[in-house]
Amino acid sequence: MIYKTLDKNDYLKYHNTLIGKDFKFSKVAIGMWDFMKAWEDWPPRVLELNGNILSVCFMKISGQAKSKVLFISNIFTPASGRGKGSAREMLHRNILEAVEAGATSIRLDCNKSALGFYDKLGMTYWGTTISHSMFCDLPINDKGVECFKQTTNMSSLEILNSYPQELRNAKIKWIMKKVKKHKEFDFEHPSRYNEFMKCFFDDKNTITT
């Protein structure tokens, strides 16, 4: 599979070849690129095989130096790419690109319709957001999607303490902002919210400062 970017004109040409739900999903993605004015700075990433596009993704790297974060949204796999591991490979390539650019973590809101995909990767969640998606903010490295298997067995405390102090404090504030007031429980996809809060109130579990 070839991992590359498309400019706006090429993506719109591709978009116009789609039908049904694929067309509708792609149209939403186009609206996001337009709204964020991201066509030049963060053009669509695509996976291509034999001239056929198997997966499309919006990604953005934000922050400076050691605080760079990979944002992922709208991993879109059209009918022609389903059942081929395209979405997994797309996310893997996104992470490798981001790590090479200096990113140390990934942040995304996981829609519940896509949780089966993220669960298989070993992803864990800090809690439920106001939009009822599961919030993920985890460290990444040059192992790509395999890095999630490493964090699966780590406690929330271990994950937070794996970051440099200045980044750790920002992570804590962001997690609190995203999930503090939304304690909805999903027993099939449990979150780290209670364990995360315990880090602040249990003398045995102290976040390193």
Q: What is each of the regions a protein language model found here?
A:
Residues 46, 52-62, 69-76:
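Conserved beta-strand in the GNAT
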Residues 88, 100, 104, 111-135:
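Conserved active-site alpha-helix within GNAT-family acetyltransferase domains
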